[in-house]
Each structure stands twice: as structure tokens, then as C-alpha cells.
Amino acid sequence: MAIGNLDWTQRGGALTLTERWGLTLAAIRKHVNLRRQARPDGASRLANTLDRLGLRALDQIEHPWDALAFAASTAAQELQPQWLTHHCWRTYAWGTLLAVNADLKYDKSLFFSACMLHDLGLTSHAAAPNDHCFTLRGARAAGDILRSAGASETQAHCVAQAITLHLNLDVGVEQGVEAHLVQAGAGLDVVGQRSQEVPALLRQAVVDKHPRLSFKHQFCSCMQNESRNTPQSRTGLYVRRLGFLDLVRQAPFDE
């Protein structure tokens, strides 16, 4: 059973010893990659589609206006603090730009909905036990919101699984392109993962439109609280053992 998928999270998101070791080794590899990415010679990266498009790439970030997207964005605005909702918008922007670079095809409405609601479990509006992983709490709440807006079970499952998977260190496209992009977008915004793939001009434009509002401080506080409540979860491992909060603070953003 894959870590982070919906079936796996039904046990509350607690890691087995084997899973903890596997994630620890993966985190070490990820940390090495982030350090390499931060080196000055990273500026000499190969040109990509976003370089060629320049600011025109921002046109791709236009969000969908169907019933599911409207329900997700409305819920995000009403149920989340502003700093967290801006993070959700940036997650969507980064994921969209990375998809342009990789020429990935996906369901834009479901991807957008998952981005808007992927951290809903960090708020008090996610109805599930506090000792369960916040991604499970958020996935359940998101499913209810989208079903109320007319989502099919297949659509609700896609969004919910993208939410529970996004806390993994990597999500392959074979696990769902939408899930892959949510994790990629959130990873870029939180720790700077793959930020070198997005030209500085585009990064600044996204942050100007959706300001960070002391994101690092706010997010680290949430993660510390989550790790105390769910010490056996992925968050508990990342925060207590793997230096996750330091990676957040070192991300290539001012706040």
C-alpha cells in the first residue's frame, strides 16, 4: 500500500517503522538535491519553455470557473486564513507553470480544486480526529465540499487523493497528474523544490499577485502544532527528525 494514498491514510496517517526509515532515506536524498539546486551554478540551467514564453506564461494560470472550482475557491476564502489561501493560489500557479514546462495534460478543474483545499486540514473546519494526519482531515472536508457542488465520486476521490499524497516527498505522474502537480506546486512554495525551473521574472510576478504574508513563520507554527498532535505522522517525522522547518526557513523567498 503506497504511503499517502487514501487507503493508507484510513489508519490515521501513522507511519510504520519501515515507512519511517524509507521516508528518512528519501528525505536525505531530497535534501542533497535542494542543496545542489541552491548553488550559484544553478543559474546556468538549460533554457526551458517558460524562458521562451516569458510573462506570457502567466496566461496559463487563469483558473477555471466551473461549479467545482467555484466551490473550492469559495470554501478556501471562507474557511482559511488569508496567508494560507494565498499559499494555495501560489501552489496552483507553480504547479501550472511546471506543467507547461513538462507539457503535462491534466484536469484543470480538479487540479485547481485540490490546490485550493490541500491544506484545509490545518484549519479548525476539517471534521476528523485531531490525532489523524491533517491531509486526511482536509481530504474528507474537501470531498464533502465538492460533492455538495455536484462532483462525482471519481472526481471527489481524485481531489482527496491529491490532498493526502501532497505531503509525500515526491509524487509520480503515475499516481495521478493532478496529485503530482499539487505536490510539485506546494513543494516549490514551501521549500523551493524545483524553483530553478521557473524563471525569476515569473516567480516575482506570482508572489506579487499572491503575497506570502509571513508564510514561513505562519506555516512553521502550524507544522509544529501538527507534529505535537500527530507525532507518528509524516509531519511528525519531518519536523522532529528531518529538519523540515529549517528547509522552510531556507526556501528562496523572503518570507
Model-assigned labels for residue ranges:
Residues 1-54, 81-89, 93-104, 151, ...:
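Divalent metal-dependent phosphate-bond-processing catalytic cores, especially two-metal-ion Mg2+/Mn2+ enzymes
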Residues 100-108, 126-127:
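Short pre-active-site segment immediately N-terminal to the catalytic Zn-binding motif
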Residues 110-209:
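Divalent metal-dependent catalytic cores for phosphoryl transfer on phosphate-bearing substrates
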Residues 48, 52, 56-72:
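Short linear elements at protein peripheries
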Residues 61-68, 106-116:
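Short coil-to-beta-strand
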Residues 57, 68-87, 92-96, 121-126:
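Active-site flanking loop/helix segments enriched in acidic
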Residues 66-70, 74, 82, 153-157, ...:
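Generic alpha-helical secondary structure signal
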